[in-house]
C-alpha cells in the first residue's frame, strides 16, 4: 500500500500558473490563511490545481517576504562558498539568504551562476597558458587523474573552490609565478647580493640578544679583578707572617709605575675635556672645582713615593690603583 494521492490527477490542471490563478490564491490566503490543509485549499478557492502545487506556488513565488529580481554579488559569494562546503543543500543555503527560496536558488545556480563561474575558470585557464611548462605538465597530470578518483559534483566543487580563491585574490597568479616578476639589471642584482653577506657579517650579536664584544669585556674585567684580589690576599698573608721574608716583585712594580703614568695621562685628558665642555655651556666658573679636584688627584698620584716605611702600604696602594684603572678602562670601552 502506497501513499494516497492528494488529489484527483485526472481533473487537475498542469503547467505554468496564469496571473488569474496567482491572484485568486494570494487573495484567499491573505484573507483566510491556509487553514493548515493544503489538500482542501484548491476546492475552497475554486482552482483546478493540486494542493502540492498551490503550496509550492505560494512558498516560492507569492509570499510577501520573497525577494524578486536578480541576485547581488554578495549573494553570489555566499551561494558559492556554501555550495563548496556543503554541496547542493539548497534549503540550508536559502536559510542564509533572507527572502530567497531554495527553489529559486537552485534554479539560479543551475541556469546562470554555475555557468558564469565555470566560464570564468576556463577563461583564466587560457590566460595562465604563459606559465612554466613543468607546472602545466603537473596540472595536466592532476586533471587527468582527478576524474578517476572524484565524482562529478566533487570535481565541480573543487573547480569552484579554485575560482573563489581567484576572485578573493586576483593577483595570486602573479605572486606565485616568478616568470611574471620584473627582472633587475645584472649590475644591480650583483650589488644587492654582495651587500647581503656584508650586512650579515656585521651583525655579531648573541642569539639571546647579548652583545658578544660587551660580554668579552666583562670577562676581561672579571679576570683582572680576580688577579688583583689574589695578589692582595697573598701580600696580606706575607705581612701577617713575620717569619716570612718579603721578596719584592720588580716586574709587578714596573707594571704599577706604567699604570701610574697612564693614569696621569688619562686624568689630564679628562680635565681638558671637562674644561672644554664648561666653555661651551658657559659653566667654566661653576665647574672649576671639578677640574681642581682632578688636578689635585693627579698631583697626589704622581707624587706618591715607592720608598715609604711599610711595604704593605705600597702593595695595597698598587692594588687600589690597578682596580681603579681597570674600571676606568672598562667604562671608556
Swiss-Prot record:
Organism: Arabidopsis thaliana
Tissue: Expressed in leaves, roots (endodermis-specific) and seedlings.
Described purpose of this protein according to its UniProt entry: Transcription factors that activates genes required for endodermal differentiation but represses genes involved in proliferative divisions, thus regulating the transition from proliferation to differentiation in root endodermis. Required for Casparian strip formation by positively regulating the expression of the Casparian strip genes CASP1, PER64 and ESB1 and other endodermis-specific genes, thus triggering correct localized lignin biosynthesis in root endodermis and subsequently regulating global ion homeostasis.
A Pfam family reported for this protein in Swiss-Prot or TrEMBL: Myb_DNA-binding
Annotated localization: Nucleus
Location of the HTH myb-type domain: 9-62, 63-117
Classification via SUPFAM superfamilies: Homeodomain-like
Keyword Nucleus set for record: yes
Region span, Disordered: 119-150
Induction: Directly up-regulated by SCARECROW (SCR), as part of the differentiation program controlled by SHORT-ROOT (SHR).
Residue ranges with Low complexity bias: 136-150
Keyword Repressor: yes
Entry protein name: Transcription factor MYB36
Amino acid at each position: 500500500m502506497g501513499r494516497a494521492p492528494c488529489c484527483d490527477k485526472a481533473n487537475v490542471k498542469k503547467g505554468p500558473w496564469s496571473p488569474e490563478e496567482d491572484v485568486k490564491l494570494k487573495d484567499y490566503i491573505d484573507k483566510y490563511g491556509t487553514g493548515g490543509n493544503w489538500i482542501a485549499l484548491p476546492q475552497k478557492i475554486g482552482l483546478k490545481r493540486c494542493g502540492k502545487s498551490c503550496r509550492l506556488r505560494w512558498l516560492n513565488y507569492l509570499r510577501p517576504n520573497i525577494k524578486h529580481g536578480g541576485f547581488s554579488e554578495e549573494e553570489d559569494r555566499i551561494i558559492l562558498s556554501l555550495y563548496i562546503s556543503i554541496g547542493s543543500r539548497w534549503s540550508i543555503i536559502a536559510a542564509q539568504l533572507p527572502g530567497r527560496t531554495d527553489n529559486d536558488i537552485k534554479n539560479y545556480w543551475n541556469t546562470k551562476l554555475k555557468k558564469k563561474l565555470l566560464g570564468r575558470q576556463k577563461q583564466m585557464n587560457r590566460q595562465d597558458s604563459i606559465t612554466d611548462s613543468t607546472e602545466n605538465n603537473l596540472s595536466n597530470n592532476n586533471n587527468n587523474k582527478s576524474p578517476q578518483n572524484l565524482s562529478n559534483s566533487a570535481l565541480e566543487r573543487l573547480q569552484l573552490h579554485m575560482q573563489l580563491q581567484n576572485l578573493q585574490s586576483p593577483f595570486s597568479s602573479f605572486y606565485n609565478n616568478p616568470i611574471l616578476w620584473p627582472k633587475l639589471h645584472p649590475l644591480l642584482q650583483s650589488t644587492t647580493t654582495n651587500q647581503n653577506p656584508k650586512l650579515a657579517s656585521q651583525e655579531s650579536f648573541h642569539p639571546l640578544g647579548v652583545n658578544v664584544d660587551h660580554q668579552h669585556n666583562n670577562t676581561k674585567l672579571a679576570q683582572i679583578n680576580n688577579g688583583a684580589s689574589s695578589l692582595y690576599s697573598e701580600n696580606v698573608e706575607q705581612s701577617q707572617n713575620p717569619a716570612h721574608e718579603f721578596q719584592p716583585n720588580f716586574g709587578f712594580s714596573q707594571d704599577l709605575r706604567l699604570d701610574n703614568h697612564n693614569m696621569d695621562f688619562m686624568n689630564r685628558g679628562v680635565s681638558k675635556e671637562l674644561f672644554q665642555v664648561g666653555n661651551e655651556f658657559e659653566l667654566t666658573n661653576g665647574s672649576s672645582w671639578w677640574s681642581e679636584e682632578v688636578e689635585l688627584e693627579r698631583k697626589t698620584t704622581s707624587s706618591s713615593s715607592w720608598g715609604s716605611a711599610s711595604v704593605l702600604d705600597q702593595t695595597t696602594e698598587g692594588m687600589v690603583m690597578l682596580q681603579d684603572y681597570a674600571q676606568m678602562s672598562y667604562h671608556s670601552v
